Amino acid sequence: MILNSEQESFRASVGSFLAAKLPISALRTLRGKPVATAYDRDLWGQLAMLGVSSITVPAASGGAEFGWLALGAVAQEIGRRLSPTPLLSSVVLAQGALIQCASPAQVARYLPALLNGDEVWAVAFEEEAHFSPDRLQTAMTPQGLCGSKGMVLDGAAADRLLVTALNESGQWGLLLVDSDTPGINQQASRLMDGRQYVAFEFSEVSESACEWVAGPAPESGWARVLNQAMAILAAEMLGSARELCERTIEHLKEREQFDVKIGSFQALQHRAAHMYSELELSQAAVDAALVAFDSEGVDQCAMASAAKALANECFQLISDESVQMHGGMGVTDELDIGLFLKRSRVCNQLLGDTHWHHLRYANRLGF
């Protein structure tokens, strides 16, 4: 990833903040807290003031306009430390949906609170057990909003929800509603990696409590947001995989068996080289996808799927190999290696597994 001087300086600043305030130990602390706790809200406010929430936002709207490569670099820093933040749920998905799907008046009204960290939002769009973004049954009926949504990331911490729903004409729509509105029931749970998700049930939520997102083309805007979220998640996975690879190589240099460093064993050298080559291949795909979002005339769907599919495979390979190369202690909770492995399994399913992205990539290329 090649960043300009401003982007690199920003990445370094965020990395230093995360190392000091949100190291891997923060994830361990989170696991012991009530399930309603998704992340440290105060620390997220500090990250927002640092500029993390405004990286891709145009300067005219109060953003830094650093571009998607810069946001990808920040996501990699978060991935290196497994830092629990609402970057994906609130910034990329919710804030992105507001910017690309809403009217200028709605953007002007709601965006400032998201940029400065005063509010965090979540998007409720998944209704199936597996990623199926095109399936939609939640609808605005004469009685109100009715339906259910599962796997809403960081949903219990959200001040507002953006909900995909069919309007009374049966057309796709996106509406905004306060998370504590009567008729909204939620069940928070933790995933195997310690992160929070919420299943929401909407039972005749009054239409007067909801606000339809009124941009000129909200459905196509939401499709772009999903592609961007896939690439940013892939960047986070890449950061985790790179950290894991570096830790494992250091272990190979230090661990001794039969009075020699195990890194001198040719079989382990070949496996380490394989990890590194897959890491660089994934890096190239992620960079290409991020650059595509700042470009015209590029198939962003194909690039996002290539990045996510390769990140899935890379992170799973490196997490598996890291556990094996650490031996018996690799499966213990005391070692951070297992936390990365659990994160790899969760990320593999988020926003489409490898098979889903292989199919979409092939379809985009006409196969």
Model feature map: region roles:
Residues 51, 75-78, 177-181, 206:
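Short Ser/Thr-interspersed hydrophobic loop/turn segments at strand-loop and sheet-helix junctions
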Residues 1-80, 101-104, 113, 117, ...:
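Alpha-helical interface subdomain recognition
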Residues 124, 148-184:
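A short core secondary-structure module
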Residues 138-140:
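A structural signal for short hydrophobic beta-strand segments in well-ordered beta-sheet cores
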Residues 192-218, 367:
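Internal glycine-rich alpha/beta core junctions
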Residues 116-128:
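A short, Trp-centered hydrophobic/proline-enriched beta-strand micro-motif
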Residues 66, 132-135, 154-158:
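Short glycine/proline-enriched turns and hinge-like loops at secondary-structure junctions
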Residues 83-105:
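N-terminal glycine-rich flavin-associated loop
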